């Protein structure tokens, strides 16, 4: 079976050591220009630009020039039903919930509305480099169905 192969070239954001250990000062950040060799959507290797990979002889290089390439961002706590009320003002939390949040979340019992917002929300996150999120839906099954249907798309 033929494998899908890609080569991406650009400035790769990486670390010499884990940035999560207590010796972070000794973990230097690199943005060197390199090539990423990908087989069936999985990174096979990251190599210097002059490296010739034997399995990628006839593959065109997608060169992003000096643009930065990094792993996707992770958002560990987001609420997709609040997309339409981002930056809505509230004097106190309970005011904000009663005036904006609860009425907006009730709209998610409509599958059409939930689907429209799910598409806008997921597209927005992906366009800004967020590839992983832990997102809340509403109490309505339609909000969950719309979210996961679009995410699977």
Residue ranges and their predicted role:
Residues 1-56:
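N-terminal metal-binding scaffold of metallo-dependent hydrolase/deaminase domains
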Residues 45-48, 72-79, 106-116:
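Low-complexity, flexible helical/coil segments
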Residues 87-153:
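Alpha-helical scaffold segments that flank or form the walls of functional sites
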Residues 14, 76, 133:
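Short, electropositive, low-hydrophobicity segments enriched in small/polar residues
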Residues 15-16, 79, 138:
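Flexible loop residues that form catalytic
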């Amino acid at each position: 079976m033929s494998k899908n192969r890609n080569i991406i070239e650009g400035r790769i954001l990486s670390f010499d050591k884990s940035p999560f250990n207590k010796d972070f000062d000794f973990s230097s950040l690199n943005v060197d220009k390199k090539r990423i060799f990908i087989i069936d959507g999985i990174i096979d290797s990251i190599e210097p630009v002059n490296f010739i990979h034997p399995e990628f002889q006839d593959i065109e290089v997608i060169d992003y020039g000096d643009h930065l390439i990094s792993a996707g961002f992770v958002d560990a706590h987001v609420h997709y039903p609040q997309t339409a009320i981002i930056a809505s003002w509230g004097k106190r939390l309970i005011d904000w919930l009663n005036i904006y949040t609860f009425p907006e979340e009730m709209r998610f019992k409509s599958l059409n509305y939930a689907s429209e917002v799910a598409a806008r929300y997921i597209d927005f996150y992906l366009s800004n480099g967020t590839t992983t999120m832990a997102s809340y839906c509403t109490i309505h099954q339609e909000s969950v169905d719309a979210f996961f249907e679009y995410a699977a798309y």
